[in-house]
Amino acid sequence: MVKTNVTIMRGGTSKGVFFHESAMPNNKNEWEPFLLDVMGSPDKRQIDGLGGGNSLTSKVAIIKKAYTSDIDVHYTFGQVSISEEKVDFKGNCGNISAAVGPFAIEEGLVKAKEPMTAVRILNTNTNKMIIAEVEVEDGQVKYDGDVTISGVPGSGSPIYLNFHDAAGSVTGHLLPTGNSSEFLDTSQGQIEVSIIDYANPLVFVEASSIGLDGTELAEEFTDLQLAQFEELRSIAAEKCGFASRFSATKLSPAVPKLAIVAKPEKYKDSTGAWHSSVEMDLHIRMMSMQKPHQALAVTGAICTTRALSVEGAIPARIAKNHSTKVRLAHSSGIIETMVEPTGIKIVRTARRIMDGTVYTHGDYQMM
C-alpha cells in the first residue's frame, strides 16, 4: 500500500482526479496499474476507488511545471476504463483541460495575474498547446460567476480554452486516411463516414445513414445500436492505425470517438428543455468509451467545428452555417464554439472539489 496526495476537480462536464507528476510512481510503466488501483477499475461500479462508474468521472490529469519560456505546465490526460484493465493515454479530454489552469494557479505552478491569467498548457498526449484564460480576483482563482454550461447545474466563472494548431493531434494528420469522407464495410452494409483529427480524432456519421434522426437522447440508444456504433468506431480505429477492428475496443477504447450528426431540428434535451432548429447549426451525439456521452466532449466540439471547414466532410455538408460562431446541439443542451485566427475557442467552467490522500492496494515505487 502507498498513499499520495490528490485533488478532485470538475472541468466542464467531466470530473477527474488530479496529480502532480511528482506524486506518481517513479516508473511510468507503473502508471497504468497505479491509476487503475486508485480509480477502482476494473469494476463497473468502481466501488473500491475514486471513480464514479461513468466515463465522464473516470478520468485523471497529471500535471508538471514546465521550465521553458513558451510553456507553463505539462498536462497528461488518462481515460481510465471502467470494465477493462486499461488506461488510454492516446487522446485528450477538453473538459478536464478546463480545470488544468485553475489547478496550476492554485498549486503555485503559474503566477496569478489579475484580472485574467493565461495558462499555457502543453497536452503531452497530443503534443498540442492549449491556452486557458482564468479569471483571478484578490490573487485567487475566481470560481463564482454567471456562466452556465449544459450538463452542469449552477453557474461559474468563465474559463476560455483556445486550442492552437490542433490538427493531427493523435494521428499526425487532419485527415488520417487522406479522405474527407469514405465508405466503410460493416455488418450492416457500407456506411459513409468522415474521419477527422483535430484536438481528438472523431469518426462522423450522418444519423440517417444508420437509421436515426439525430435528436435521440443518450439514454434512448439500445444495446444493439451501441454494438453497431462500436463496430463502426473499431473499423475506423483500424483505418487510423490504432488497432485492428477486432481488438480496438480493448486496445484503443477512447479514440477515435464516434460522432453522429444531423441537420438542425427541434428537440427536447435531457433536462426537458425544448430547443428550436434556429438555435443550432448541427445536431451531434457522441460516444465515449462505448457508451453515449451525456453531453459533448470539448475536443469533440472543437473537432466538429474544424470539420465544418473541410470540403466534402459530412458535418460540412449538413451544417446550417459555417460562420465563426458554431452552435452544436447535444443530449444535454447546446454548446458554442468560436473560430478565431489563433485557433478555436470554447468557454467552460471548473471547480475544485476536494484535496486529500488516496490509499492504494498495491505497492509502487513513488517519486
Curated annotation (Swiss-Prot):
Q: Kindly provide the name given to this protein in its UniProt entry.
A: Putative isomerase YraM
Mind listing the GO molecular function terms for this protein?
isomerase activity
What family, per the record? Belongs to the PrpF family.
Report the source organism: Bacillus subtilis (strain 168)
Listed as disulfide-bonded, the cysteine pairs are: none
Cleaved signal peptide residues = none
- Fetch the Gene3D superfamilies from UniProt: Diaminopimelate Epimerase, Chain A, domain 1 (3.10.310.10)
Q: What Enzyme Commission number(s) appear in the record? A: 5.-.-.-
PANTHER family, per the entry: ACONITATE ISOMERASE-RELATED, DUF453 DOMAIN PROTEIN (AFU_ORTHOLOGUE AFUA_6G00360)
What is the uppermost EC class here? isomerase
Which domain of life does this protein belong to? Bacteria
Keywords from UniProt, A to Z, are:
Isomerase
Q: Which Pfam families match?
A: PrpF
